[in-house]
Curated annotation (Swiss-Prot):
Residue positions of the active site: 314
Record keyword Magnesium present: no
HAMAP family: EPSP_synth
Subcellular location: Cytoplasm
Role summary: Catalyzes the transfer of the enolpyruvyl moiety of phosphoenolpyruvate (PEP) to the 5-hydroxyl of shikimate-3-phosphate (S3P) to produce enolpyruvyl shikimate-3-phosphate and inorganic phosphate.
GO MF entries: 3-phosphoshikimate 1-carboxyvinyltransferase activity
Pfam families, per the entry: EPSP_synthase
Annotated pathway: Metabolic intermediate biosynthesis; chorismate biosynthesis; chorismate from D-erythrose 4-phosphate and phosphoenolpyruvate: step 6/7
Major site of localization recorded for this protein: cytoplasm
Biological source species: Nostoc sp. (strain PCC 7120 / SAG 25.82 / UTEX 2576)
Family, as annotated: Belongs to the EPSP synthase family.
Annotated protein name in UniProt: 3-phosphoshikimate 1-carboxyvinyltransferase
Enzyme Commission code(s) on record: 2.5.1.19
Length: 425
């Protein structure tokens, strides 16, 4: 297995970095551009395993896509809600967003579409999304466990109507249904039962739909209403840098008492993970916002924090990786749903912190991390890109940290370590 040794610094980080486009926005923009009528150009698009799996699936459905990786640009020739391909065998790898978005997209088609992914993807929940589609009259045949991949969808144009959806494990199912709803045969109302996790991603979805010309009405009781007959408008669209991926660079400033500036990303971002800046401020960092950049300056000593991370759960690993350096405990709450991500993320973070000698208490929905001197170790990443990226930051403060399988970052940030080492050069 490949490994990367992280060189500990005896000085603060001082760098300005450029972050590739947001994965979440790239995938949403790609879907709505595919449904629009005409040609759209997506600038600063993310090119990674996840986004490329998604783009390939859309192209297999008969919607022309031209990728320009050197320009970070994707051109999409949308078909106005039509799915030209009547049969397709679609592979999504470990891309949960692609799995759920493509599942919804093919419901608009009139054909036979098989979806599958890697073994871990077969363990990730799809149940409520496929149940809504079945309740709308679409036939789905499961090859294994009901509600899980692989399965075949027999599309017949999504009917729309009134549906109830549980979104306590992932909000991607809700986002998928929202984005196809304008092309349903009738108005659609989606009522979310119980707690909606990662609400910030749903807000991102609604904002992007509006950017492409479609209105969503949300009531206070977590009901979403979309009128049928609305259509996305093809357009030129620039994608923000990825706030989740920026978190590791901001964390490097925090943990070394240094300075990191990320260009083209501000607190006005539509990404929920921009809330990471608030977390760092509460831990003692100074956050400076310019017209088109954000800068974090780390303190001499990080402070502990007790925080609900439900709306920024992709950052649990980032916080976990710097928490041992705080002056008091760090408590992370309300993220039970991350047990169903690329790996069982709560258990993975707890296990690797304990490997480093850190005192950690695991909860059903989070953890408590005590300030602890760290023992050097090789970090197991569990094929999870965020484990590799987060614990690389730990290595800036403590000598002897080695990241196993660093190539797993290709899922969302292929040149992460190139940019990481440039930051500390």
């Amino acid at each position: 297995m490949d490994t990367i040794a992280i060189p500990a610094l005896n000085r603060p980080v001082d760098a300005t970095v450029e972050i590739p486009g947001s994965k979440s926005i790239t995938n949403r923009a790609l879907l709505v551009a595919a449904l629009a009528q005409g040609d759209s150009t997506l600038e600063n698009a993310l090119f990674s395993e996840d986004s490329e799996y998604f783009a390939k699936c859309v192209e297999q459905l008969g919607i022309p896509i031209t990728l320009h990786p050197h320009l970070a640009q994707i051109q999409v020739s949308g078909k106005g809600g039509d799915i030209p391909a009547k049969q397709a065998d679609l592979f999504v790898g470990l891309a949960g967003t692609a799995a759920r978005f493509i599942t919804a997209l093919v419901a608009l088609g009139n054909g036979e579409y098989r979806l599958d992914g890697v073994p871990r993807m077969r363990e990730r929940p799809m149940g409520d999304l496929v149940t809504v589609l079945q309740n709308s009259g679409i036939t789905i045949n499961f090859e294994g466990n009901s509600g899980f991949m692989p399965y075949t969808i027999y599309g017949q144009q999504f009917a729309g109507g009134h549906f109830r959806l549980k979104a306590n494990q992932t909000s991607q199912q809700l986002s998928a249904l929202l984005m196809i709803a304008p092309y349903a045969q009738q108005d659609t109302t989606i009522e979310v039962e119980g707690t909606l996790v990662s609400q910030s991603y749903v807000k991102m979805t609604c904002r992007l739909m509006a950017d492409f010309g479609v209105d969503v009405t949300q009531t206070d009781d977590n009901q979403f209403h979309i009128k049928a007959g609305q259509r996305y408008q093809a357009r030129h669209y620039t994608i923000e840098p990825d706030a989740s991926n920026a978190s590791y660079f901001f964390a490097a400033a925090a943990v070394t008492g240094g300075r990191v500036r990320v260009n083209h990303l501000t607190k006005q971002s539509c990404q929920g993970d921009i809330l990471w800046l608030n977390v760092l401020e509460q831990m003692g960092c100074q956050v400076i916002e310019g017209a088109d950049y954000t800068e974090v300056i780390g303190p001499e000593q990080l402070q502990g924090i007790d925080i609900d991370m439900n709306d920024m759960s992709d950052l649990v690993q980032t916080l976990g990786a710097i928490a041992p350096y705080a002056s008091s405990p760090v408590i992370i709450r309300n993220v039970e749903h991350i047990r169903y991500k690329e790996t069982e993320r709560i258990r993975a973070v707890v296990t690797e912190l304990r490997r480093l000698g850190v005192k950690v208490e695991e909860f059903a929905d989070g953890m408590k991390i005590e300030p602890t001197p760290i023992t050097p170790a090789a970090i197991e990443t569990y094929h999870d890109h965020r484990m590799a990226m987060a614990f690389a930051v730990t290595g800036l403060k403590t000598p002897g940290i080695v990241i196993q399988d660093p190539g797993c970052t290709a899922k969302t940030f292929p040149d992460y370590f190139t940019r990481f080492f440039k930051m500390i050069d």
